[in-house]
A protein has these predicted regions:
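N-terminal, post-signal-peptide soluble/periplasmic segments
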Residues: 1-23, 83, 100-116, 121
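Extracellular/periplasmic, surface-exposed regions of secreted and cell-surface proteins
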Residues: 93-102, 107-112, 117, 121, ...
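Residues embedded in well-ordered regular secondary structure
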Residues: 1-72, 243
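Short glycine-enriched, charge-decorated loop/helix-capping segments at active-site entrances
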Residues: 74-80
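Short, glycine/acidic-rich beta->alpha junctions
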Residues: 38-40, 84-89, 173, 292
Length: 399
């Protein structure tokens, strides 16, 4: 015994046991009050494919809906406060044989995603409090219908958090498309081929804040005196529903690649060459200056009877984030190899393949940061104000 007075008197314990005074001596089962027995998931999928010699296609449609466990009161709100996720997606793949030696391929993917949560944080507040707030902390409602509270739990009535705190809506969209055109020359130019690829990817993230505060009151009446006065004291005030929107991210990436190659052989001598140009344009958000990369490359490969191998490659890359005059980087490389298992004298039953190879090259790191002090812009309702400051004494080069 620490000599202190008991936290609960015998009268308190009896009132909790009998439930005779639920407003002054509550015993709330928070999980039963707030949670449903299940969280339904519905998913619908439709896909079909077809085509013939000239064209082939595949289409996939998907609808996904998942509800959360929280209960909601449709008589109080015209909107959903329960956690919910809806997703709609479409994917198509199409291959077209323009000629016997010319192929066109296009793939498209689009997705719309909408997540709803209560105005109070689910994991950081509602579900946490549901398992940590004592059952006798406060009544859900007072006798006059107001939300219950105490000086210790002033504004976090769990029912209010789940049902009366408004909601957040998180719309997300993704769109991707890539297309490739390939042609293989014939006749005197057999072995020569050309290809072009273009892709576009975008994603959009938004957060709509429709949360609001709710009013709570503490209540007291002597449970042992039927004629005692009721006492109410306001603990928290209601607030207007927010109408704020934040654009978390709107990024876009474009990629273009064009290549020409020529493969041929003379007896056991095999040659493969390829020239490539690529352009990459990435914008991280509506406020960011696009990051652009141009690259050109050449590669030549040779092998004799697939035994002796040699390769040479060189690439040049240009980044707009580097200092003017230092935006280009040149990166050569060479390599050689020997497939020993191709030799007539190599006869080892337990080894199917053995290869020796060596390579040397110079590479670069394009993740060294930007030469510009700021690669973003200030966004107002109607215009952009770009920041044009440069670093001084802190040049950035190819790393």
């Amino acid at each position: 015994n620490d000599g202190k007075s008991a936290l609960y008197s015998q009268t308190d314990l009896e009132l909790y046991r009998t439930g005779a005074s639920p407003y002054t001596h509550p015993n709330v089962d928070w999980q039963d009050l707030l949670l449903r027995n299940s969280a339904p998931i519905q998913q619908y999928n439709l896909n079909f494919s077809g085509g013939g010699k000239v064209a082939r296609y595949f289409v996939d449609l998907n609808v996904y809906n998942q509800d959360g466990f929280l209960k909601q009161d449709n008589s109080l709100n015209s909107y959903n406060t329960r956690e919910n996720v809806k997703k709609y997606s479409l994917r198509t793949n199409t291959d077209i044989a323009i000629t016997d030696h010319t192929q066109f391929k296009v793939n498209v993917f689009g997705q719309m995603y909408r997540e709803t949560t209560p105005g109070k944080a689910i994991m950081g507040s509602i579900y946490r409090d549901m398992y940590t707030v004592p059952n006798n902390a406060y009544p859900v409602f007072n006798p006059n219908g107001t939300l219950g509270a105490t000086p210790l739990y002033q504004s976090n009535n769990l029912y209010g958090q789940a049902v009366m705190s408004g909601y957040y809506l998180y719309p997300k969209t993704d769109f991707n498309i890539d297309a490739t055109l390939e042609h293989y020359f014939q006749g005197a130019l057999k072995g020569l081929y050309a290809s072009a690829t273009y892709s576009y990817n975008s994603s959009y993230r938004e957060a709509l804040n429709r949360s609001k505060g709710f009013e709570t009151w503490s209540y007291w009446k002597d449970p042992t005196d039927p004629n005692a006065m009721e006492e109410y004291l306001q603990m928290a005030s209601a607030s207007s529903q927010s109408n704020a929107t934040s654009y978390n991210r709107l990024n876009r990436m474009q990629y273009l690649e064009m290549a020409v190659g020529y493969d041929f052989n003379v007896k056991k001598n095999n040659f493969r060459t390829k020239i490539l140009y690529a352009y990459n344009d990435f914008t991280a958000s509506v406020k960011n200056i696009p990051l652009r990369k141009n690259s050109v490359g050449f590669r030549a490969e040779y092998d004799y009877d697939k035994r002796y191998l040699a390769e040479f490659a060189i690439a040049g890359m240009n980044l707009n984030t580097l200092k003017p005059g230092d935006q280009w980087g040149i990166f050569p490389s060479v390599g050689a190899g020997w497939n020993m298992h191709k030799e007539s004298w190599f006869d080892v039953a337990v080894i199917d393949a053995m290869k020796l190879r060596a390579s040397f090259g110079i590479n670069g790191n394009d993740g060294t940061g930007a030469y510009y002090r700021s690669s973003s812009a200030t966004l107002s309702d109607y215009y952009y104000t770009y920041l044009k400051y440069y670093k001084t004494g802190d040049n950035i080069y190819w790393g």
